[in-house]
């Protein structure tokens, strides 16, 4: 057996499938039509130029002609210009950069910038490098440092049992070192590499250098030109293996560092056009084709596509005159075939004859799950994913060869507007090249992301042959050839495979044989605002319906007017279904002609029905249809009270990959459904997909979608629940996973439930006190247990600034149509550490369908450090923020300034997640709610019965800090008592806040005692004059005023406090340290410390004016602590900055030494006195405690206080103090990592979009 297995040849042809599409046979017939002369734009995560198979074409040309990042994720602001001094430049990182002597720079000026490597490293690479850096750079050194600190602490504890003040400090010092090292380990965070970037003009072209070694020795770094000039690229190191190229824009003011954002793009490019001269069996479909790599997946957004990236990409596609675009991306869209991005795609296709191939989506098996643009845009060829038996063996190592099938997850049509959705299918899996940074040569990936480049490569072969033979083609003729020659698989439905599996050789023959003018045209089919007839809801199929269909020819861009005039086409219209009636003929000229189609679905059985009305040129009927009108009808099953609103199926047989669809008319009043699946097989565990979709106009399918991938064990049971909309048809799909082996039998039931609330969203205003909502059990007996949970508070922001400007050279559409940006700036305060979700309500959830080019927000802290970013789908971009002030910058782009100006006051919201959820009390009648008595628990509601509920307001002390008027709390209302019902039937709740109650302060100054005598005006004047003099004393720096006031008011404490603050705040403070000490002593001497200590020791104060006394005592304590700290800081500064005098007399030296000892003794006394009154980590005391530690050379204690100072005031100077102490302690690894954080935490400006 083993011998037979090893002798069987390895199925190389199944690793990257070409046989199934006819690509292999085509290349056997025409080996030179291997993609030569064809340029494919790969719009993806970027292509690694160093990956296997990405170097040359079959005819020796560069495989990748250019590499462009259109997202802006690799952009570096290099607007700062500097000139070297002595051959050196100080980079924005603070490193000294040595300019090599052999660099040519006639102007002598360099543009400099800075970039954190983790800003553009792919996520997987970043995680790997972080792990490796910790293991190699941090852990070994840190373990030694921690062990040494623990050893010292233990030795001290053994040797010293005394509790003297000196020993106490030493013990604290050693303990601090251990605590700090443990804390650094817990808080370890790798800033990643920080690269200085230089750009200059050498007299002929722009050049760039990235200090990839981070040591300033630029002679060892790679100098690069724009990639398209010489196909140059560099690498960030042997550990990273991350290849990069550059592009320089705006006269050197902007550098784009281009890296791959993920492995996806390289894999896609390898499928389409990889070439291995030594291993041709590993070649992609079109090894002779060239590639234009365009990165549209923004690394900042986990490689999500953005409007900015896509529109810039289409500009590049047009400028490079690309023949093909492969786009293995897409999202669900609320309305198909519309939006700014789709308009630009249409322009590239219709006007510039670029064939746009895209993935249909990976959201099957339900119908109408095609993504945008692949399955929803008329100009785009959407490709479904097919899996062949050879692929199953070679790629997936299945034990058995199963019949060819569509992958379970491949998206299905039709589009929501009736278009077929999927155009063609191709193999949806491959083992192909991936970037070097993955440390793999190849990888298995599957998806319509893989079927699209397989089809795209096949089309490249066709175009290569057409170009070699000078055969004209258009996007319309090529698409028609693909669709009319594709092979339909009998066991795969039309909505999955489209017109069938692409056949390269047959499509080529078709185009060679059919060269008529009519075949070069496109035809737009419209049914009102739709592109097909799609009857899905019960009301649409209840009676026959007539549909007006418009058919209009689309001419290639450069068609002569004479050809348009002479155009006359005689068409035969056919339909192969009896339930559709259409005209038999149509005469078409250069205008839109309308026909009427009648659809009568009344006699159709339950389920799905599809047909087409096809238009044939009577002159060449064998060429296949010139256009098709797709018609889909869904006949839904009904459930009623007699069946308890259940739909049951028993002992249902499933083969591998088999799909069963059930269309059900959801009963009016149903709000959720429960599906129960039970296995009847005792020997086979099975993988199933449960999928349900309801379609609502102008809502993406994902808005009302349920999806669950599950493993069903032998004789096992699974129960799931999902929300439904009453009165509309729902598709419930249960599918056996495509790779499952053996057959299996199951029972399953779909059961509908309904608890209807009066409002689809509950809006509660706190001022109303009590809010009512009513509930009805609409179908059957239901157990109720209403519960309102609030999980976040939402803050609304208005822009503090709005700026509009024209964008750069990358943002000019054909015919010099300039794009503009508006940048809106918002500010908000984060009251405490927590998770936030920023979003722009007007624009969010819109991407391809948006009328604006893009939306991108970036959030910054008060030091302009980038904290996070997001775009169209806010739920994907939650982030954690510490307490502090933050700025949000939102970029919106459009071609028209007037449209941007309308948004200059655009609101923005920040949703703050509550650390603990809040609940609102719910009562069953108004009286109980009014009195705050018995709350509702649970009850059983019979069918059609109503029950009112009353919600009371949230107590004021529960309102989260920072929330106030203009904010609201967001959460949900659940009504069902069952866990499944709670999970599925959820009603949104908004609780709108009002101003907090006014609180009267204790010890109010307005409260006068009866015994207190009013001050006369003269006394008031004298006091006011005194206070005015004190105020001006600090401004004028006048000692005379102080002396005068001291004589007049010798016991007035605020005078001495003001004098102390005045001296301590002076510019020449260091020269007046002794005066500060004297001033502090004066303040201290005027406070009765005994009385203060006695007051603090009191447990309660029974006196009637206790609040006033407390206020006075608190002020005295604060003043005392402040004076002690200022005195201590002055004494410490005196010791820290004392300089020895060379050549000083012996007597002077002795005097200095005695003075120093006296000062040190005074400092120690002040320190211990301070500890009597307050904690050393009090904000006021931290600076003194820090300086006291420095004087005593206790750097562990100093660092402990310094880190606390950073937490209170995270300035660059405070961080530098920490770094200095780390170095003094010998913790160079901690210092190094912290130093690397500084340019990230304190960037010179906001990062560019």
Curated annotation (Swiss-Prot):
GO cellular component: cytosol; nucleus
Family (UniProt): Belongs to the peptidase S8 family.
One GO MF term attached to the UniProt entry: peptide binding
Enzyme category, top tier: hydrolase
Basic and acidic residues bias (residue ranges): 1003-1018
Gene: Tpp2
Residues that bear N6-acetyllysine: 401
Cell membrane recorded as keyword: no
Function: Cytosolic tripeptidyl-peptidase that releases N-terminal tripeptides from polypeptides and is a component of the proteolytic cascade acting downstream of the 26S proteasome in the ubiquitin-proteasome pathway. It plays an important role in intracellular amino acid homeostasis. Stimulates adipogenesis.
Organismal lineage: Eukaryota, Metazoa, Chordata, Craniata, Vertebrata
Other notes: The limitation of proteolytic products to tripeptides is achieved by tailoring the size of the substrate-binding cleft: the two negatively charged residues Glu-305 and Glu-331 that are blocking position P4 limit the number of residues that can be accommodated in the binding cleft and thus create a molecular ruler. At the same time, they orient substrates so that the tripeptides are removed exclusively from the N-terminus.
Gene3D superfamilies: 1.25.40.710, 2.60.40.3170, 6.10.250.3080, Peptidase S8/S53 domain
Protein's UniProt name: Tripeptidyl-peptidase 2
Biological process terms in GO annotation: intracellular amino acid homeostasis; protein catabolic process; proteolysis
Pfam family, one: TPPII_C
Modified residues (N-acetylalanine): 2
């Amino acid at each position: 057996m083993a011998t037979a297995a090893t002798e069987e040849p390895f199925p190389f042809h199944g690793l990257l499938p070409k046989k199934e599409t006819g690509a292999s046979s085509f290349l056997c017939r025409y080996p030179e039509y291997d993609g030569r002369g064809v340029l494919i734009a790969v719009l993806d995560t970027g292509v690694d130029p160093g990956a296997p198979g990405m170097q040359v074409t079959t005819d020796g040309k560069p495989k990748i002609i250019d590499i462009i990042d259109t997202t802006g994720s690799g952009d570096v602001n290099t607007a700062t210009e500097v000139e070297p001094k002595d051959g050196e430049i100080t980079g924005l990182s603070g490193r000294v950069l040595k300019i090599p002597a052999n660099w040519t720079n006639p102007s002598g000026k360099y543009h400099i910038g800075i970039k954190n490597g983790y800003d553009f490293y792919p996520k997987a690479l970043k995680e790997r490098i972080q792990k490796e850096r910790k293991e190699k750079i941090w852990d070994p050194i840190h373990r030694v440092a921690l062990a040494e600190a623990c050893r010292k602490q233990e030795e001290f504890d053994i040797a010293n049992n005394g509790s003297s003040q000196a020993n106490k400090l030493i013990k604290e010092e050693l303990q601090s070192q251990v605590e700090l090292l443990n804390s650094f380990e817990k808080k370890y965070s790798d800033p990643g590499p920080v690269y200085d970037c230089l750009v200059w003009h050498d007299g002929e072209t722009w050049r760039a250098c990235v200090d990839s070694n981070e040591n300033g020795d630029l002679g060892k770094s790679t100098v690069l030109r724009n990639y398209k000039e010489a196909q140059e690229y560099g690498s960030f190191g042997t550990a990273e293996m991350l290849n990069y190229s550059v592009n320089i824009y705006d006269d050197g003011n902007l550098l784009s560092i281009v890296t791959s954002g993920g492995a996806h793009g390289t894999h896609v490019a390898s499928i389409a056009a990889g070439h291995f001269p030594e291993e041709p069996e590993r070649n992609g479909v079109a090894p002779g084709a060239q590639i234009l790599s365009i990165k549209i997946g923004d690394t900042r957004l986990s490689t999500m596509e953005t409007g900015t990236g896509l529109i810039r990409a289409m500009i590049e596609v047009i400028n490079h005159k690309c023949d093909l675009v492969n786009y293995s991306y897409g999202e669900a869209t609320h309305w198909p075939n519309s939006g700014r991005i789709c308009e630009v795609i249409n322009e590239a296709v219709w006007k510039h004859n670029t064939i746009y191939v895209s993935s249909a989506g990976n959201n099957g098996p339900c119908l109408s799950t095609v993504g945008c643009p692949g399955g929803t845009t008329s100009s785009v060829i959407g490709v479904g994913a097919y899996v062949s038996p050879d692929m199953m063996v070679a790629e997936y190592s299945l034990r058995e060869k199963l019949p060819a099938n569509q992958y379970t997850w491949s998206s299905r049509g039709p589009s929501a507007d009736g278009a077929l959705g999927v155009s063609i299918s191709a193999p949806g899996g491959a083992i192909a090249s991936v970037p070097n940074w993955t440390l793999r040569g190849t990888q298995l990936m599957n998806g319509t992301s893989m079927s699209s480049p397989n089809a795209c490569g096949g089309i490249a072969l066709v175009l290569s042959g057409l170009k070699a033979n000078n055969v004209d083609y258009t996007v319309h003729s090529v698409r028609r050839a693909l669709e009319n020659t594709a092979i339909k698989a009998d066991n795969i439905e039309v909505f999955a495979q489209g017109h069938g599996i692409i056949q390269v050789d047959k499509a080529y023959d078709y185009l060679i044989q059919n060269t008529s003018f009519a075949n070069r045209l496109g035809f737009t089919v419209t049914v009102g605002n739709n592109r097909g007839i799609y009857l899905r809801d019960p009301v649409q199929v209840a009676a026959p319906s007539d549909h007006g269909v418009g058919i209009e020819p689309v001419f290639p861009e450069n068609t002569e007017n004479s050809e348009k005039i002479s155009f006359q086409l005689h068409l035969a219209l056919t339909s192969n279904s009896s339930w559709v009636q259409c005209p038999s003929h149509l005469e078409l000229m250069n205008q839109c002609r309308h026909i009427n189609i009648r659809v009568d679905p009344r006699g159709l059985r339950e389920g799905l029905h599809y047909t087409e009305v096809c238009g044939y040129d009577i002159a060449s009927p064998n060429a296949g249809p010139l256009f098709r009108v797709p018609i889909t009808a869904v006949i839904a099953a009904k459930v009623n009270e007699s069946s308890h609103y259940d739909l049951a199926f028993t002992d249902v047989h499933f083969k591998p990959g088999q799909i069963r669809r059930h269309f059900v008319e959801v009963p009016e009043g149903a709000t959720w459904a429960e599906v129960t699946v039970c296995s009847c097989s005792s020997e086979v565990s099975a993988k199933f997909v449960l999928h349900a979709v309801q379609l609502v106009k102008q809502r993406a399918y994902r808005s009302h979608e349920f999806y669950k991938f599950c493993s069903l064990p032998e004789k096992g049971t699974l129960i799931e629940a999902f929300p439904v909309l009453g009165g509309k048809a729902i598709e419930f799909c249960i599918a056996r996973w495509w790779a499952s082996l053996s057959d299996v039998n199951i029972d399953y039931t779909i059961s509908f439930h309904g608890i209807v609330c009066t409002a689809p969203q509950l809006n509660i205003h706190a001022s109303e006190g009590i809010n009512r909502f009513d509930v009805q059990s609409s179908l059957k007996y239901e157990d109720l247990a209403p519960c309102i949970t609030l999980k976040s508070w939402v803050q609304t922001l208005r822009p503090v600034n709005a700026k509009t400007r024209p964008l750069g050279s990358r943002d000019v559409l054909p015919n010099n149509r300039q794009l503009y940006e508006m940048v809106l700036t918002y500010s908000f305060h984060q009251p405490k550490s927590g998770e936030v979700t920023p979003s722009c309500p007007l624009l969010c959830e819109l991407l391809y369908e948006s009328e604006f080019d893009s939306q991108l927000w970036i959030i910054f802290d008060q030091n302009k450090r980038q904290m996070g970013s997001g775009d169209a789908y806010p739920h994907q971009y939650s982030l954690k923020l510490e307490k502090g002030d933050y700025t949000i910058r939102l970029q919106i782009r459009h071609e028209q300034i007037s449209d941007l100006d309308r948004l200059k006051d655009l609101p923005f919201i920040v949703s703050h997640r509550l650390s603990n959820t809040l609940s609102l009390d719910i009562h069953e009648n108004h009286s109980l709610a009014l009195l705050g008595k018995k709350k509702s628990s649970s009850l059983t509601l019979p069918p059609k019965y109503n029950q009112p509920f009353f919600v009371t307001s949230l107590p004021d002390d529960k309102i989260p800090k920072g929330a106030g008027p203009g904010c609201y709390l967001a959460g949900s209302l659940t009504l069902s008592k069952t866990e499944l019902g709670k999970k599925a039937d959820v009603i949104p709740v908004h609780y709108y806040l009002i101003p907090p109650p006014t609180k009267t302060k204790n010890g109010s100054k307005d409260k006068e005692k009866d015994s207190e005598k009013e001050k006369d005006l003269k006394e008031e004047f004298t006091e006011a004059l005194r206070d005015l003099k004190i105020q001006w004393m600090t401004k004028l720096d006048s000692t005379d005023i102080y002396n005068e006031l001291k004589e007049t008011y010798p016991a007035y404490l605020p005078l001495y406090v003001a004098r102390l603050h005045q001296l301590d705040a002076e510019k020449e403070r260091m020269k007046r340290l002794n005066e500060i000490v004297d001033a502090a002593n004066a303040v201290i001497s005027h406070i009765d410390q005994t009385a203060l200590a006695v007051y603090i020791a009191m447990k309660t104060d029974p006196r009637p004016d206790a609040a006033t006394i407390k206020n006075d005592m608190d002020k005295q304590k604060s003043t005392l602590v402040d004076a002690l700290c200022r005195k201590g800081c002055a004494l410490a500064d005196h010791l820290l900055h004392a300089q020895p005098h060379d050549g000083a007399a012996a007597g002077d030296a002795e005097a200095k030494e005695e003075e120093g000892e006296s000062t040190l003794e005074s400092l120690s006394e002040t320190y211990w006195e301070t500890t009597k009154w307050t904690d050393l980590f009090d904000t006021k005391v931290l600076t003194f405690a820090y300086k006291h530690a420095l004087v005593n050379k206790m750097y562990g204690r100093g660092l402990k206080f310094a880190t606390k100072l950073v937490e209170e005031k995270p300035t660059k100077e405070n961080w530098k103090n920490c770094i200095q102490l780390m170095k003094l302690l010998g913790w160079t690894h901690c210092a190094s990592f912290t130093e690397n954080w500084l340019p990230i935490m304190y960037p010179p400006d906001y990062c560019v979009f």
